[in-house]
């Protein structure tokens, strides 16, 4: 196989002040892909809710911060337990029990009360009701 072309440092044609450009040494040669191009790894994107959690925190308590560990815990609560999926599934079951084909805010509210424990459910319901009221008033 033919060796790769030697790369030269790109500093915009200028060397840093007081230093001469240094040539890179060829330590370990790697072979190129058969097509002559390097294969790029696609970075898998992780879905996180960190920015949304932070925005809600700032709306509720503007002067309060959150540590990375606490953010990680809240993020895992939302993503790994699939809380949205659980609420939707429970709301679907409630609609089916009542022989209705539409999931309304009432089914969502009841499913949140069933899934989330105690005080957390109360806060979630009150914030959800507030959000629905705000949305309803803005669309008129």
UniProtKB/Swiss-Prot annotation:
<dbReference type="InterPro" id="IPR055333">
    <property type="entry name" value="HISTONE_H2B_site"/>
</dbReference>
<feature type="cross-link" description="Glycyl lysine isopeptide (Lys-Gly) (interchain with G-Cter in SUMO); alternate">
    <location>
        <position position="7"/>
    </location>
</feature>
<dbReference type="GO" id="GO:0003677">
    <property type="term" value="F:DNA binding"/>
</dbReference>
<dbReference type="GO" id="GO:0030527">
    <property type="term" value="F:structural constituent of chromatin"/>
</dbReference>
<keyword id="KW-0832">Ubl conjugation</keyword>
<keyword id="KW-1017">Isopeptide bond</keyword>
<feature type="modified residue" description="N6-acetyllysine; alternate">
    <location>
        <position position="7"/>
    </location>
</feature>
<keyword id="KW-0007">Acetylation</keyword>
<feature type="cross-link" description="Glycyl lysine isopeptide (Lys-Gly) (interchain with G-Cter in SUMO); alternate">
    <location>
        <position position="24"/>
    </location>
</feature>
<dbReference type="GO" id="GO:0005634">
    <property type="term" value="C:nucleus"/>
</dbReference>
<comment type="function">
    <text>Core component of nucleosome. Nucleosomes wrap and compact DNA into chromatin, limiting DNA accessibility to the cellular machineries which require DNA as a template. Histones thereby play a central role in transcription regulation, DNA repair, DNA replication and chromosomal stability. DNA accessibility is regulated via a complex set of post-translational modifications of histones, also called histone code, and nucleosome remodeling.</text>
</comment>
<dbReference type="InterPro" id="IPR007125">
    <property type="entry name" value="Histone_H2A/H2B/H3"/>
</dbReference>
<dbReference type="InterPro" id="IPR009072">
    <property type="entry name" value="Histone-fold"/>
</dbReference>
<dbReference type="Pfam" id="PF00125">
    <property type="entry name" value="Histone"/>
</dbReference>
<dbReference type="InterPro" id="IPR000558">
    <property type="entry name" value="Histone_H2B"/>
</dbReference>
<keyword id="KW-0158">Chromosome</keyword>
<feature type="region of interest" description="Disordered">
    <location>
        <begin position="1"/>
        <end position="47"/>
    </location>
</feature>
<keyword id="KW-0238">DNA-binding</keyword>
<feature type="modified residue" description="N6-acetyllysine; alternate">
    <location>
        <position position="24"/>
    </location>
</feature>
<keyword id="KW-0544">Nucleosome core</keyword>
<comment type="similarity">
    <text>Belongs to the histone H2B family.</text>
</comment>
<comment type="subunit">
    <text>The nucleosome is a histone octamer containing two molecules each of H2A, H2B, H3 and H4 assembled in one H3-H4 heterotetramer and two H2A-H2B heterodimers. The octamer wraps approximately 147 bp of DNA.</text>
</comment>
<feature type="cross-link" description="Glycyl lysine isopeptide (Lys-Gly) (interchain with G-Cter in ubiquitin)">
    <location>
        <position position="134"/>
    </location>
</feature>
<feature type="modified residue" description="N6-acetyllysine">
    <location>
        <position position="14"/>
    </location>
</feature>
<feature type="cross-link" description="Glycyl lysine isopeptide (Lys-Gly) (interchain with G-Cter in SUMO)">
    <location>
        <position position="25"/>
    </location>
</feature>
<protein>
    <recommendedName>
        <fullName>Histone H2B</fullName>
    </recommendedName>
</protein>
<dbReference type="GO" id="GO:0046982">
    <property type="term" value="F:protein heterodimerization activity"/>
</dbReference>
<keyword id="KW-0539">Nucleus</keyword>
<dbReference type="GO" id="GO:0000786">
    <property type="term" value="C:nucleosome"/>
</dbReference>
């Amino acid at each position: 196989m033919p060796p790769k072309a030697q790369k030269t440092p790109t500093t915009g044609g200028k060397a840093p002040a007081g230093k001469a450009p240094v040539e890179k040494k060829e330590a370990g040669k790697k072979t190129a892909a058969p097509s002559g191009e390097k294969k790029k790894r696609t970075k898998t994107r992780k879905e996180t809710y960190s920015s949304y959690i932070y925005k809600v925190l700032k709306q509720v308590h503007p002067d309060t911060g959150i540590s990375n560990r606490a953010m990680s815990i809240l993020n895992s609560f939302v993503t790994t337990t699939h809380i949205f999926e659980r609420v939707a599934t429970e709301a679907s079951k409630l609609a089916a029990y009542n022989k209705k084909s539409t999931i309304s805010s009432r089914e969502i509210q009841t499913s949140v009360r069933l899934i989330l424990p105690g005080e957390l459910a109360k806060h979630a319901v009150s914030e959800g009701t507030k959000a629905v009221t705000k949305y309803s008033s803005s669309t008129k």
